[in-house]
């Protein structure tokens, strides 16, 4: 068997920034390490099935009710109501990406 290693691709590391955090929603902007400060390469096209939300404080899964991407790479994530000061963890899975930094970056309600 012959393999051309020049055809192999590594995973793109992804970071997250959270904003508009509330008891039922938050926005997540997802960027790779590529591009520039003014024109970063964003992670686009994710759907609800790519994401899971977990309440670290209560040790319980949180139901995501809807996800909308607008603008590109920024996701409005709506979920079942959570208690103020609870800590949430967003986990994303998508081929070609490494979301370890996103998972480590928790969200405080």
What annotation goes with each model-predicted range?
Residues 37-62:
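Short, surface-exposed alpha-helix to beta-strand junction/turn motifs within ectodomains of secreted
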